[in-house]
Regions:
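Hydrophobic helical h-region of N-terminal Sec-dependent signal peptides
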Residues: 8-12
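A structural boundary/capping signal
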Residues: 19-222
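Bacterial N-terminal signal peptides that target proteins for export
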Residues: 1-7
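N-terminal signal peptide c-region/cleavage motif recognized by signal peptidases
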Residues: 15-17
Length: 222
């Protein structure tokens, strides 16, 4: 019930936009509103507001702002939302649908942090096994420096924690915009090639480039 109340507030938050929209922002908001509905457009406006207001924050503050924003959305499995076993939604599709699974939460956070200027070398999308839930899961890892332990942004546990504190997660592989790693331990892993080896990643990037939107099979927008 509490999450529903928070999310309802997110839907209404940008009813009066308090920042100057650039052309891309305005086009995204209009496109999403026309495709998914007015409330969806307001969520995109709220996202752009977070990006604008977070621009001058420290990197750790940016992590917190982005993690908190996206964790307000609903968790729904791909088969229930998209009618597919596995579908990686773009950030606009995620916000437009008001729901997504762990990959959608992580992808939206990753691209927002990249937009906020965090170097790709510091970020990874990490595919893990959630031991307690006995299912595969995805989180975002942030490395403050090349040799440091990462912290994890997650939708299951909303508190940003060091990877060593997440004994409930077993890493499998990780990737970012250019590289793919196999995870042999809770560290950085072994380089296994380019992220272009991942078909779902390539499909996602193509849809982002063309700003293509797909419609979910079920409406979670209130």
């Amino acid at each position: 019930m509490r999450k529903r109340a928070i999310l309802f507030g997110l839907f209404l938050l940008p009813s009066i936009v308090t920042f100057a929209l650039n052309n891309s922002d305005a086009q995204w908001i209009d496109k999403v509103a026309n495709f998914y509905g007015e409330r969806a457009g307001k969520r995109v406006a709220a996202w752009r507001n977070v990006v604008t207001e977070s621009a001058e924050l420290s990197e750790l503050e940016k992590l917190s702002a982005v993690n908190n924003f996206f964790n307000q959305l609903y968790f729904v499995n791909d088969i229930d939302l998209w009618g597919k076993k596995d579908y990686w939604a773009t950030p606009l599709e995620f916000l437009g649908s008001a729901a997504g699974d762990c990959e959608d939460f992580s992808i939206a956070k990753y691209f927002t942090l990249r937009e906020l200027g965090i170097d790709d070398k510091k970020l990874r999308l990490v595919y893990v096994k959630a031991i307690k839930l006995n299912q595969f899961h995805m989180v975002v890892a942030y490395y403050p420096s090349p040799s440091s332990e990462p912290v994890l942004l997650d939708n299951i546990d909303p508190e940003i924690k060091q990877a060593s504190k997440r004994r409930d997660l077993l890493p499998v592989y990780s990737f970012n915009g250019s590289r793919l790693w196999l995870m042999k331990e809770r560290g950085r892993g072994e380089l296994a090639g380019n992220s272009s080896r991942l078909g779902l990643w390539n499909d996602l990037r193509a849809r982002m480039g063309s700003v293509k939107l797909n419609r979910p099979i079920k409406n979670y927008d209130g």
